[in-house]
Regions:
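Catalytic cores of carbohydrate-active enzymes across secretory and cytosolic contexts
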Residues: 1-412
Length: 412
């Protein structure tokens, strides 16, 4: 069950419950104005920024009555979802509620269908008590109380669970039991996708792009939390501090636009493209483009790049998990090295086999890139083998099963 996000979705919602690939699917129709206020203003422009630590506190947030109106829309969407679940769910069913968009559903379902057992899973990081103060007090407390109405709340890492509990404690909200269930790729599905003709064609293009040079790769949405600009600046610092890498390494960035209704995202895209141009103007030669940026959403090419990297840079400011950090090692056949932000949830699983960096430290990131590029083959192979094992340890199936298990009377 999901909210209808577009006019075609709303037309589909009018058909009621549908059968899609053997699944019963229902789209819940919420009017466009209400949905936009809830999704764009509350979720994308506020909750996402709070949980990822993205606000520039000198200027934002600055809440007024417009946020209050948007929060009422957020509440309305959650009520609509609760009403729909109440009508569809069998007696005593387990309801798995996903992410920060729907933190209030269980609170409303408790009155409508007390027989249902609701489990919430947060895919993002969870902010700490200081970060939560960047929301209006009433909204923050209502959100926590809504999460507290679940029989359990799940997170990708223990540190996000601990932050949630700390927020509840500070505001006098009783936290439900929490559990940790890291999501992972499906290795078989990933391998099947990588074996497609489109990926084979893209692999030839990646080989030509590298031109015999070492290859640093990143695959991301153009999203402030992904820290793309600092990654580019760290690459510039690598070329400054270690001139032996000039004309010997190419940074291939497969980055695609996201949430361009938000001014921060439009500005960040401009900053990314201008930084790419700056690095290339500074170091490029007639025969070498230091940074090759592909701004299209090209999944086959992204898979091909993940199969070919010598170094994979994943340096988010904060990330609930980051699946690319797991997909890369599973796809890569070069014993590629992973340079990974300590603030990615995946670092809690992969950190021993990756080169972990502070995402704000350009010098440390540049040094990690140099270390990765100069690492001897036995260490590369050892780390790559460990990464493959760790990345495959959790699958979509184990993640799903953990949520269902958390709904059982003995809990997580």
């Amino acid at each position: 069950m999901a909210a209808a996000m577009s006019d075609p979705d709303r037309e589909a919602a009018a058909q009621g419950t549908m059968d899609v690939d053997g699944l019963r699917v229902r789209l819940v129709d919420v009017d466009a104005v209400t949905f936009t206020a809830a999704y764009e203003v509350v979720c994308n422009a506020n909750l996402w920024f709070v949980h990822h630590g993205l606000f520039d506190a000198t200027h934002r947030p600055a809440h007024d009555h417009r946020f209050d109106a948007a929060w009422a829309s957020y509440r309305h969407v959650n009520v609509a979802m609760a009403d729909a679940v109440a009508k569809e769910a069998p007696e005593g069913a387990v309801v798995l509620v996903q992410d920060y968009h729907l933190t209030l559903v269980a609170k409303f379902l408790a009155d409508l269908r007390p027989d249902l057992r609701c489990v919430h899973f947060t895919h993002t990081p969870f902010t700490d008590p200081d970060g939560l103060r960047m929301l209006p007090d009433a909204a923050a407390t209502e959100m926590l109380a809504g999460l507290g109405a679940h029989v359990a709340c799940g997170f990708h890492t223990q540190r996000w669970a601990d932050r949630f509990v700390a927020c509840c404690t500070e505001r006098g909200v009783t936290a439900p039991p929490t559990f940790v269930a890291p999501l992972g790729p499906d290795p078989d599905d990933l391998a099947s996708s990588a074996a497609s003709p489109a990926v084979a064609t893209a692999s030839h293009a990646i080989t030509a792009l590298a031109g015999g040079r070492r290859l640093v790769v990143r695959v991301d949405r153009i999203e402030p939390s992904k820290n793309i600009v600092r990654g580019l600046r760290a690459f510039d610092l690598l070329l400054t501090e270690y001139p032996q890498w000039r004309e010997k390494v190419t940074f291939a960035a497969f980055i695609y636009p996201s949430r361009e209704t938000l001014p921060e995202y439009l500005a960040y895209r401009q900053e990314v493209t201008s930084t790419v141009a700056w690095v290339n103007d500074r170091w490029g030669t007639a025969d070498w483009v230091p940074v090759v940026a592909n701004l299209g959403d090209d999944y086959p090419t992204s898979l091909a790049a993940l199969g070919a990297y010598d170094v994979l840079l994943v340096n988010p400011i904060r990330d609930g998990l980051n699946l690319v950090a797991k997909e890369g090692p599973l796809l890569n056949d070069h014993d590629g090295v992973l340079v990974l932000s300590s603030e990615a949830g995946a670092a809690d699983e992969l950190g021993d086999a990756a080169l972990v960096v502070n995402p704000f430290d350009l010098a440390a990131t540049a040094e990690a890139l140099h270390r990765a590029l100069t690492m001897d083959n036995p260490e590369r192979a050892e780390r790559a083998t460990a990464l493959r094992s760790l990345a495959a340890a959790h699958s979509p199936h184990t993640w799903f099963d953990a949520q269902v298990a958390a709904a059982e009377p003995n809990g997580p």
